[in-house]
Amino acid sequence: MNFQRMTDLNLAGKRVLIREDLNVPVKNGVITSDARLRAALPTIKAALEKGAAVMVFSHLGRPVEGEPKPEQSLALVAAYLTEALGQEVKLFTDYLDGVEVEAGQVVLLENVRFNPGEKKNNPELAQKYAALCDVFVMDAFGTAHRAEASTEGVARFAPVAAAGPLLAAELDALGRAMQTPEKPMVAIVAGSKVSTKLDVLNSLSGICDQLIVGGGIANTFLAAAGYNVGKSLYEADLVETAKQIAAKVSVPLPTDVVVADASQINFEDFLGSLAAAQAVIKKVEDVTANDMILDVGPETAKAFANILTTSKTILWNGPVGVFEVDQFGEGTKALSLAVAQSDAFSIAGGGDTLAAIDKYNVADQIGYISTGGGAFLEFVEGKTLPAVAVLLERA
């Protein structure tokens, strides 16, 4: 993919406006996870080291436009950045008509979603953002699938528009996995429903050599192959769709599974009741009417791990079992370790996948971990990300 990169630009004395994803969780006035802030720091520091006058902006939460509320302010983020950067980071609430910032300084602009027209990508608002800067840097991959004034609109009107290091790294990794994958390529796609991952499955079936499915998605594929899935989560209306996908790409199915008696499960306290449920390993052909499949069995986990060992590219989206409960997490654990130990280039994305990576402590052994949730899935689906498309246009 051809786009301008912030790292290639001369920023000395330039006014640089950086769109980051600083949408951090806040509880009782405390930031509960600073992961997104830590991810943004290298970009901000790099712009400062290049001698830029830096302005950073982001959204936080889902405020009603034009109705700013203190709990949705970026004030806590400004305090965090002040400490992390070792210099004062002032928060500007009134900035659309201009901001005073000098080379070597960084300021934070208040929550973009306080501005009427932000979400609808109002061109007048986008032009006001663009007028603040000499260079606009899009670095928020997590919002790249949204055409908003601070993501797509400003990039259209700014004198220069470039990708920041975070966004560039995401696009390079996704391009390597999806556009120029080294073969054989294996994708792991798991989740509760085929319907929510249908575009992902269809897209990957045309690219990868083998498609490992897990969770409720795997149950639908098992039903399509004629197996009884008992009380397991599956989508009867998508059995034919599963057959069509399996006709296009090799989909290795589980040969054994881990089940629980559905009558022991309280669906109003699903994870709580599962913790007390007995896990039973069964051959897939032995699943009974009252069984609920909650993980792949050890034989299947070993077979899937062997597939991953011989692959050159791995794309991973979703755990293959209810890994939050240990007796139904062995399959996801085995696959996590197999991805980590493989020599393949691996890319992982999606909230549950990241939680599994954290649980099994393999983050350092994954080639690239995508920060982008919905944007990651839309890229994998083959959809155009508006904030990326404008950077490609302007390159």
Swiss-Prot record:
Keyword set includes Nucleotide-binding: yes
Q: Where in or outside the cell is it found?
A: Cytoplasm
Q: Which GO terms describe its cellular component?
A: cytosol
Its catalytic activity?
(2R)-3-phosphoglycerate + ATP = (2R)-3-phospho-glyceroyl phosphate + ADP
UniProt main location, coarse: cytoplasm
**Endoplasmic reticulum as UniProt keyword:** no
Instruction: Give all cystine bridges in this chain.
Output: none
- What protein name applies here? Phosphoglycerate kinase
- Which residues does ATP bind? 197, 324, 350-353
Keywords in alphabetical order, please: ATP-binding, Cytoplasm, Glycolysis, Kinase, Nucleotide-binding, Transferase
The text of the family note is:
Belongs to the phosphoglycerate kinase family.
